[in-house]
Amino acid sequence: MSDIIIAFILGIVEGLAEFLPISSTGHLILVGHLLGFEGERAKTFEIVIQLGAILAIAILYHKRLVSLCNIKPLLRKEKKFNAFHVFLGVFPAVVAGLLLHDVIKTYLFQPYTVVIGLVAGAILMIFAEVKKQEATSYSLDDLTYRQALTIGLFQCLAVYPGFSRAGSTISGGLLAKVNYKTASEFSFLIALPVMVGATGLDLLKSWTYLSVDDIPMFAVGFITSFIVAMLAVVTFLKLLEKIGLKPFAYYRILLAILFTVFVLL
């Protein structure tokens, strides 16, 4: 299979899975394993196509991101979504990521560990659906600092490949009495700085694996993930309020079972 086709397939996988509660990292590792595209070059490629998904969110939420630069609501202690909400949502995962980065990259980026993450994340999502209470926050401006921190703590679970950043943060939001749409949007916004930081750190450590010959492949993957992520996010927000997290959780469990039976055993 040509590199361009592999790039196109993995770009679709990244764009679909990055902001859905199904784990993009897990899917990239599993699909890469099936395609025979593994190793340091594959890891570097995954970093680059994540940038496409990051750009999609930055464009979709550019107005909200620009508004975070206004510190007046924060200084006036207004009950309005501001940069401190994002800080509380990001800080725990940044600390966890920095402390565990090398361990995770060395030991946890394996198909069998991803299967564990898929199942564990699915259990959390089902638990959140069962235990959620009536929401008190129906928009980002309703979000309290405590709710933001709670979601940020749940984001720490996403450092484990296969767990899913969206799955863990949206689950945390539901348990903190935040509705689906608000939890999802906050999940997207706090994913940006974490992903940019993690991607930057990975690129610094992986730049030696980059080659001029890889530019066409990496470009196809980047563009594909960008376009697919744009479409996936808009569709997901509409779909989530109708069906909740359980269908995604069941899909994760089914995927883990199928991959274990047909590939790992």
Curated annotation (Swiss-Prot):
One of its GO terms (molecular function) is undecaprenyl-diphosphatase activity. The keyword Hydrolase applies. It is found in: Cell membrane. Keywords: Antibiotic resistance, Cell membrane, Cell shape, Cell wall biogenesis/degradation, Hydrolase, Membrane, Peptidoglycan synthesis, Transmembrane, Transmembrane helix. It is an enzyme of class 3 (hydrolase). Its EC number is 3.6.1.27. The chain crosses the membrane at residues 4-24, 42-62, 84-104, 108-128, 184-204, 217-237, 245-265. One of its GO terms (cellular component) is plasma membrane. It holds the Pfam family BacA. InterPro entries: UppP (IPR003824). It catalyses: di-trans,octa-cis-undecaprenyl diphosphate + H2O = di-trans,octa-cis-undecaprenyl phosphate + phosphate + H(+). The keyword Flavoprotein does not apply. GO terms for biological process: cell wall organization; peptidoglycan biosynthetic process; regulation of cell shape; response to antibiotic. Belongs to the UppP family. Catalyzes the dephosphorylation of undecaprenyl diphosphate (UPP). Confers resistance to bacitracin. Bacitracin is thought to be involved in the inhibition of peptidoglycan synthesis by sequestering undecaprenyl diphosphate, thereby reducing the pool of lipid carrier available. PANTHER family: UNDECAPRENYL-DIPHOSPHATASE (PTHR30622:SF3). This is Undecaprenyl-diphosphatase 1.
